C-alpha cells in the first residue's frame, strides 16, 4: 500500500523548482500542482498495491506536469501568433 502523501504545497514547489533548476511562475504553478496531485490520486486509486506512489513520486510527477503545461502554453501562444499573422 502506498504511503500517505504528506508534502505541503510550499515544500513541493521548492523541491520541484530544485529538480527543474529554475523558478516556476505562480500562474504555471497554480495550474500544475492541482493537476499533478489529482493525477497521483487517480493512480493510487487504480493501483493501491503500488508502494512507490509517495512524496518523491509526486515531486517527479509535478515537475513533468510543469514542463508539459509550459510547453502547452508555448504552443498555444505560437499558434495564436501564426493565426493572427495570417489574418492580416
Stretch-by-stretch model annotation:
Residues 2-71, 75:
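N-terminal segment of the canonical double-stranded RNA-binding domain
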Residues 70-88:
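Ampiphathic alpha-helical segments that act as solvent-exposed interaction surfaces
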